[in-house]
């Protein structure tokens, strides 16, 4: 390893649905953090690893900051706050088309307590007129002393390469923590469950999305060398179970079809996906079930 190899951990933080997962997936080049047009889709810290010949960045994608409504919400916000004290740099991401809000001030107040450099990332610049950008920059400049302010469009890829170069410049010298071909530190089961959950979020509406968890029950190869994946979608109410199954099972088939496509792309092999639905009342407020479904923390 060269003596000037750089590496570091970077936290991506912001209000719900500002495009944090979209940005990380664009940088890494694979879908490892789920994306949805519904807020609060990211639950566990997801580490995306980006490696070049002279640097390695480990991105931590946190739940969006929001006012919690239940113990799962408390858990999500606690993860986001904890990461501020664990990382080498912080990326505070905002939506260009939403402007300054109370949720942003809450995050800025949190940032006053940290020593790591903070970069303001203004995302979704493709949704505003260029004349709207400068007033937004001036507003945030008056609120906090950011290391740099960088406008991007994570979805379109605009200015993302420049942002990565800037972040690389600020990395400390350090070891290569992960092999160069590794893009996440999460096991396959976790990423597969996230891909299934993404399809539920995308295809269902109203109260169903944030009332669901996905548990991978079994992964094995069958006699035809096809990967058999069995998973359970857990929801809180029987009425939600009906929505997830759909008329004559059409919704569940749709979820399975779309999830299978992404899982096959991830694993590079043919997949047979079996999905079941289970009702676990009020699971988001039950510590033992949060633990069972993969939310491992003393801060539920």
Swiss-Prot record:
Region listing for G5, in residue ranges: 152-154
Assigned keywords, A-Z: Cell membrane, Cytoplasm, GTP-binding, Membrane, Nucleotide-binding, Ribosome biogenesis, RNA-binding, rRNA-binding
UniProt protein name: GTPase Era
Entry's Gene Ontology cellular component terms: cytosol; plasma membrane
Gene this chain is encoded by: era
Region spans: G1: 14-21
Subcellular location: Cytoplasm; Cell membrane
Region (G4): 123-126
Domain KH type-2 positions: 204-281
Protein's job: An essential GTPase that binds both GDP and GTP, with rapid nucleotide exchange. Plays a role in 16S rRNA processing and 30S ribosomal subunit biogenesis and possibly also in cell cycle regulation and energy metabolism.
Taxonomic lineage: Bacteria, Bacillati, Bacillota, Bacilli, Bacillales
